[in-house]
Amino acid sequence: MRIFFASSDGIALEVLKKISDQYDVVGVLTAPDKPSGRGLSLKVNDIKREALSRKITVLQPVVLDADVINLVKSLEPELMLVFSYGKIFKQEFLDIFPVGCINIHPSLLPKYRGPSPIQTVILNGDSVSGITVQKMTLEMDSGNILAQSQFEIKSFNTSVDIFEYVSLNSFDLVIEALNKLLKGDIGIVQDKNNATYCSFLGKEHRTIDFKLSAFDIKNKINAYNPWPLARARLDNNEIIFYRADFISTNDYDDQVIGKIIAFDPSKGLLVKTGDGILVVLELQRIGKKVLDCVSFYHGNRDLIGKVFS
């Protein structure tokens, strides 16, 4: 089968490698190169780099216009596989592919349709999530489900952890979905009454409010890693938080909210919140290295009693 692959995110790299090993990938659609670093030199993303290493045609249009459509048609693809491309496809584009178009979405659809399912499932404190391969339609993430699996989310898992899991565990579902398509299986219609949605996460929400519960704060910290990274201030320095857990307890109720009350080598850096204790596991002073809580504490032994703001 001649497959056209669309992605702009490293989460899809393993799928691109495996699908290219087993099928004829005739083209890759990805985002334009972006300026990066102090010199603002153009940076090639992982998807483009892998495609070029395999001598696969790479398209990086700003707009999916008529010229792009004609170029894709000239590649004579049969199916399009999409995994975190970042743009909406019009029907004219979807109609190029006679076998159809399928999309990998990292949630248990119809739950968490939209651009940030991995972060949102952590923000909401869910204990399970999943991977869905669906047929593509004009309505976002609403196509028939061809394959789906679920996995457990641990309390201290970050978005980085889930991205890695999804990256390594999506390919088998793609094969299951392809086999169903070729057999004429239309999949399972999503129940729109159970659909929920997620939106883009921005920098404006990354500041930690320690008046919230420890559970909600640790969810925010873990969800916002690797971006936009939750943060607070300590001694007029910005501190970035990368990983956390929590303890549900009424102890320390007499302590000031945001106060670093203790360091426990077996748990982490303990911070008083509006409800419970935040256990900080990884953090960073701006401009310094990311450290585990033990290393951070040993380099800042005067932490106990200080207050985050």
Curated annotation (Swiss-Prot):
Pfam families: Formyl_trans_C, Formyl_trans_N. InterPro entries: Fmt, Formyl_trans_C, Formyl_trans_C_sf, Formyl_transf_N, Formyl_transf_N_sf, Formyl_transferase-like_C_sf, Met-tRNA-FMT_C, Met-tRNA-FMT_N. It comes from the Bacteria. CDD domains: FMT_core_Met-tRNA-FMT_N, Met_tRNA_FMT_C. Attaches a formyl group to the free amino group of methionyl-tRNA(fMet). The formyl group appears to play a dual role in the initiator identity of N-formylmethionyl-tRNA by promoting its recognition by IF2 and preventing the misappropriation of this tRNA by the elongation apparatus. PANTHER family: METHIONYL-TRNA FORMYLTRANSFERASE, METHIONYL-TRNA FORMYLTRANSFERASE, MITOCHONDRIAL. This is Methionyl-tRNA formyltransferase. It comes from Borrelia recurrentis (strain A1). The gene is fmt.
